[in-house]
């Protein structure tokens, strides 16, 4: 029966055209933003260009990397329900090295280049005359930042590649019982290694280095978990979009509404978790009213005497990423409806893009919110890149891990 499945993905010509077209839009947006801002001799003006690149690259890197976290977490939990669409998740995670290289180049230019408007702590003269930066210089310094970034992106890349390679080891033959046990054990061990790296990076140090240090005098102990929740729910939304897309083309016959329901549950649950962290971080800092901490939110929403330039996006962020999932995804039927879950997935991806925008852009433009369409254009370019790389990865290997020991569990999955 398995031989009748559409097990090989053929990239539609129209899909290729769209992905290349979106990348062209992104490249054009980069060029326009460079001409209008990036090439300006005033560092405060050119910082606007680099902030747009930083925001988009970090957001999409963390989002595609979250898909590998999903694979490893479900592997450790022996969650076989996701095996029927695992190859989709693996294909998305194959974007990590490509976007990782782009992100690395941007970060290195910002840290080692002449413009230190975004990362003030990277300027030796600024550190020399700032007691707070000098105190934090053991952690916030260019050498440690570079080494940590190389280890992080390199580790995600190599471990992700290893896990994807192991997944395809049984494509050509059915394993014996002993081989199946060994296969499960090896996958469990390597997934555990990846989870440890993920915990040490995404759940702790990397958001501090890449994003929180944009406001080097400010800190929040919830910041890394906040970033994890935002990127993970976006990653689940991205998986859902690709699964529905392939289902509509007649692929993934063994994936059904039961699997979509669980993907929707993840989106709903982590939208609520994100909101819990959003509220806790905001409420504790705002009502404690310590000037060194409230400055982060005053810069975005203002205080009693004035309205902040990012006030609209700050509250829109909460509406899209909390109220919309709460009101729409709470109902069982909405998580099982292809149209509704796809619409919500796209909305969540955009909502958390906005979340990262309001995290990054105030560091470059604290007094006004820049024209956002060019930033969106760059984001569209990254979407096209993800579409292109994911499709190429899907086309290289069978869409079904047909000899995986847990495949039966995925076939009979019911929720």
Task: Map each language-model feature to its residues.
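N-terminal signal-anchor module of multipass membrane proteins
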Residues: 1-66
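Long, contiguous internal "core" modules enriched in hydrophobic/ aromatic residues
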Residues: 13-30, 36-42, 136-316, 404-407
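TerminUS-proximal long segments
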Residues: 13-15, 125-130, 311, 320-415
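Juxtamembrane/interface segments at transmembrane-helix termini
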Residues: 36-49, 73-86, 163-169, 214-216, ...
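Non-cytosolic membrane-interface motifs at loop->transmembrane helix junctions
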Residues: 50-56, 85-87, 216-227, 365-377
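Transmembrane-helix bundle segments that line or gate the permeation/cavity pathway
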Residues: 57-173, 191-195
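Hydrophobic cores of alpha-helical transmembrane segments in multi-pass inner/ER membrane proteins
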Residues: 62-71, 101-102, 149-161, 229-244, ...
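Hydrophobic alpha-helical membrane-insertion segments
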Residues: 94-112, 269-278, 343-350
């Amino acid at each position: 029966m398995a031989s009748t499945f559409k097990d090989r993905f053929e990239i539609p010509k129209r899909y290729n055209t769209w992905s290349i077209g979106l990348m062209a839009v992104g490249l054009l947006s980069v060029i326009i933003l460079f001409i209008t801002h990036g090439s300006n001799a005033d560092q405060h003006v050119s910082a606007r260009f680099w902030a747009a690149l930083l925001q988009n690259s970090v957001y999409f890197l963390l989002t595609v990397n979250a898909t590998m976290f999903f694979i490893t977490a479900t592997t450790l939990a022996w969650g076989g329900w996701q095996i029927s669409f695992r190859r989709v998740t693996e294909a998305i995670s194959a974007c990590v090295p490509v976007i990782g290289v782009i992100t690395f180049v941007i970060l290195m230019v910002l840290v080692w280049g002449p413009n230190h408007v975004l990362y003030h702590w990277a300027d030796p003269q600024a550190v020399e005359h700032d007691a707070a930066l000098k105190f934090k210089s053991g952690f916030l310094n260019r050498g440690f930042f570079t080494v940590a970034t190389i280890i992080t992106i390199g580790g995600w890349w190599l471990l992700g590649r290893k896990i994807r390679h192991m997944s395809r080891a049984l494509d050509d033959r059915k394993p014996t019982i002993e081989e199946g046990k060994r296969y499960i054990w090896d996958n469990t061990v390597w997934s555990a290694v990846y989870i440890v790296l993920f915990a040490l990076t995404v759940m702790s140090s990397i958001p501090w280095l890449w994003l929180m240090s944009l406001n080097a005098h400010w800190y929040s102990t919830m910041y890394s978990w906040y970033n994890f929740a935002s990127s993970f729910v976006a990653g689940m939304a991205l998986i859902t979009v690709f699964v529905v897309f392939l289902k509509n083309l007649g692929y993934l016959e063994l994936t059904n509404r039961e699997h979509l329901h669980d993907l929707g549950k993840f989106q709903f649950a982590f939208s609520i978790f994100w909101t819990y962290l959003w509220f806790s971080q905001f409420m504790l800092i705002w009502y404690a009213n310590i000037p060194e901490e409230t400055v982060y939110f005053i810069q975005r929403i203002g205080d009693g005497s004035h309205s902040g330039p990012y006030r609209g996006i700050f509250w829109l962020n909460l509406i899209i990423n909390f109220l919309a999932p709460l009101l729409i995804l709470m109902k069982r039927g909405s998580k099982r409806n292809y149209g509704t879950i796809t619409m919500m997935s796209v909305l969540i991806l955009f909502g958390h893009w906005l979340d990262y925008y309001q995290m990054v852009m105030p560091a470059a433009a604290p007094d006004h919110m820049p024209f956002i369409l060019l930033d969106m254009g760059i984001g569209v370019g990254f979407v096209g890149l993800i579409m292109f790389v994911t499709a190429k990865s899907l086309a290289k290997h069978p869409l079904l891990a047909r000899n995986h020991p847990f495949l039966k569990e995925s076939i009979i999955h019911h929720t």
